[in-house]
């Protein structure tokens, strides 16, 4: 929808009617903080006129509304929405999210470069502007078995793709600090380009060394103190509010007009049920303002500061020459979009229907033999046992210990003490490996839940009390090509098929949302007390988030960066 420079100039001067004019609204100027009543003239995908009166070939009355720049999600994994990029686009763009910067490392851990290319191809067909960062840590560490491995030489051919924004979150921060050769090769290859960070709880001189590697942005701060240290050291801090990782309340105190130029908003991992019930970046905006953050600071972080942090200089303001990404709101506090333009296109059913689709990738990716109940035994001859302790609303876990006496060579689950069995089974057809352990925090009294969404290697993860139900749930996912399942009493109570890499559904997001409601209810019937049990389970297998995790190779002490004996 681009227009010639001559057309943009003439329409901006008002010599000819603009392609589209938003009439009689008030623009929230993120430079001055003013609310100014003005028309907004649009030529193709560009804003060409503000602070004046215009006529247009098409005019939309925005009387009583407030116009703000479209929102930018600065870090997310689309796969965590459990739908394809096309359904994600349809789900969030009408809420005002006109740009999203994704790291497709979930699908890349299943099928490698094929997964990244799928996202790059899909991005060309969407209403929103989906930008891709090249996945830096596939797999995230050496302590897991993924479906693929990507080195610097593998990423090099995609570095100059027009939709690529640098290198995605560098999760292997110990590898950076220890100058691991593979890590160093990627950092050197992307030197001078944008490199996104991931350094939970990293402080002091170790943080200095990590930033000195050229890493510019980071989303893992969970306290204001941690975020302020990263700001002081020159990082742009991305405030996160996902379905499990909920850091906005802890960080809202730093979301001030002084700090806003160096702050952004992101969701990281958010499923369609939470998006439908609460929202996306729009939910973060409403929540931050309700908690006392100044609206100017919040809207800057949601657009202008985000654009600046990632080098997207053509957006973030409602001003001539900028991309026509605009959300028309009921109020700044309510942040409910009545109309959204993405690159000058109205984000409505007609726009979504006009998109051309592409074939999905990574079908039939669950390559594991039938699983017997005995596979979930936890052998051992010592009572002293490591236990993963869940912290609700966090992906950081506690490294607990419990006395669990073996019975016939097996340490058994104990629902009275909230000690459930957790198992991770390699499902990429490589080693057939598996590991078992214990987790506290689910509140599970019976049955089992299983998932192939298992960060970041995406092996098959199961939590349960009854071994037969664990096997039933796990084997059901083999038949579904991956997904979620809840089992109890020898029956499958609920399920959701995710056949695209074992990560994404081919169904509309409304159907996925409804299935998640049923899954949550089924999990609660087992006694589960967690608000989002499936994403919480997924993060229990990510060995770059402190303190204790589990992969197909064993229990991982993240602080020592080693597998427990």
Swiss-Prot record:
Keyword Manganese: yes
TM stretches of this protein: none
GO molecular function per UniProt: adenine deaminase activity
GO terms under biological process: adenine catabolic process
InterPro entries the record matches: Adenine_deam (IPR006679), Adenine_deam_C (IPR026912), Amidohydro-rel (IPR006680), Metal-dep_hydrolase_composite (IPR011059), Metal_Hydrolase (IPR032466)
Xref: CDD domains: AdeC (cd01295)
Keywords assigned by UniProt, alphabetized: Hydrolase, Manganese
EC number: 3.5.4.2
Protein known as: Adenine deaminase
The organism's taxonomic lineage, starting at the top: Bacteria, Pseudomonadati, Pseudomonadota, Alphaproteobacteria, Rhodobacterales
Family: Belongs to the metallo-dependent hydrolases superfamily. Adenine deaminase family.
Stored Pfam families: Adenine_deam_C, Amidohydro_1
PANTHER family the UniProt entry points to: ADENINE DEAMINASE (PTHR11113:SF2), N-ACETYLGLUCOSAMINE-6-PHOSPHATE DEACETYLASE (PTHR11113)
Cofactor(s) it depends on: Mn(2+)
Catalyzed reactions: adenine + H2O + H(+) = hypoxanthine + NH4(+)
């Amino acid at each position: 929808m681009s227009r010639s420079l001559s057309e943009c100039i003439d329409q901006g001067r008002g010599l000819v009617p603009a392609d589209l004019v938003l009439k009689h609204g008030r623009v929230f100027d993120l430079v001055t903080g003013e609310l100014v009543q003005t028309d907004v003239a649009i030529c193709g995908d560009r804003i060409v006129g503000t602070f004046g009166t215009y006529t247009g070939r098409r005019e939309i009355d925005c009387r009583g509304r407030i116009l703000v720049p479209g929102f930018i999600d600065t870090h997310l994994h689309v796969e965590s929405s459990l739908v394809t990029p096309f359904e994600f686009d349809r789900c969030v763009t009408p809420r005002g999210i006109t740009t999203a910067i994704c790291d497709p490392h979930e699908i890349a851990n299943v099928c490698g470069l094929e997964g990244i290319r799928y996202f790059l191809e899909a991005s060309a067909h969407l209403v929103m502007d989906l930008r891709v960062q090249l996945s830096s840590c596939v797999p995230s560490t050496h302590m897991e078995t993924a479906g693929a491995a990507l080195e610097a030489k593998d990423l090099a051919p995609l570095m100059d793709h027009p939709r690529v924004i640098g290198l995605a979150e560098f999760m292997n921060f110990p590898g950076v600090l220890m100058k691991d050769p593979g890590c160093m090769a990627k950092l050197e290859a992307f030197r001078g380009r944008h490199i996104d960070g991931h350094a939970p709880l990293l402080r002091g001189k170790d943080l200095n060394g990590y930033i000195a590697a050229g890493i510019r942005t980071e989303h893992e701060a969970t306290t204001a103190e941690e975020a302020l240290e990263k700001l002081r050291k020159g990082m742009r801090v991305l405030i996160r509010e996902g379905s499990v990782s909920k850091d906005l309340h802890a960080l809202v105190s730093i979301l001030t007009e002084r700090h806003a130029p160096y702050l952004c908003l992101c969701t990281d991992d958010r499923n369609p049920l939470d998006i439908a019930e609460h929202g996306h970046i729009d939910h973060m905006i409403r929540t931050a303002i309700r908690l006392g953050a100044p609206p100017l600071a919040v809207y800057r972080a949601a657009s202008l500061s985000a654009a600046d942090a990632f080098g997207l200089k053509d957006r973030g303001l409602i001003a001539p020459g900028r991309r026509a990404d605009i959300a028309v709101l009921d109020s700044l506090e309510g942040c409910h979009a009545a109309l959204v333009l993405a690159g000058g296109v109205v984000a409505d059913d007609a726009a979504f229907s006009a998109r051309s689709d592409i074939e999905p990738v990574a079908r039939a990716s669950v390559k594991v033999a039938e699983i017997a109940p005995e596979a979930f035994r936890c052998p051992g001859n010592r009572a002293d046992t490591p236990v993963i302790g869940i912290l609700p609303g966090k992906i950081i876990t506690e490294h607990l210990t419990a006395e669990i006496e073996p019975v016939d060579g097996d340490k058994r689950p104990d629902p009275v003490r909230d000690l459930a069995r957790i198992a991770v089974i390699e499902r990429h057809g490589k080693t057939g490996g598996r590991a078992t352990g214990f987790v506290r925090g689910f509140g599970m009294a019976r049955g089992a839940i299983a998932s192939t969404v298992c960060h970041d290697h995406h092996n098959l993860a199961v939590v349960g009390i009854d071994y037969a139900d664990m096997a039933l749930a796990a084997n059901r996912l083999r038949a579904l090509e991956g997904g979620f399942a809840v089992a109890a009493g020898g029956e499958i109570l609920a399920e959701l098929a995710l056949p695209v890499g074992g990560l994404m559904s081919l169904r509309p997001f409304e159907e996925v949302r409804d299935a998640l409601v049923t899954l949550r209810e089924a999990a609660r019937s087992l006694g589960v007390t967690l608000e989002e049990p499936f994403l919480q389970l997924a993060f229990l297998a990510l060995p770059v988030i402190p303190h204790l995790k589990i992969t197909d190779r064993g229990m991982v002490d993240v602080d020592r960066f080693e597998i427990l004996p």
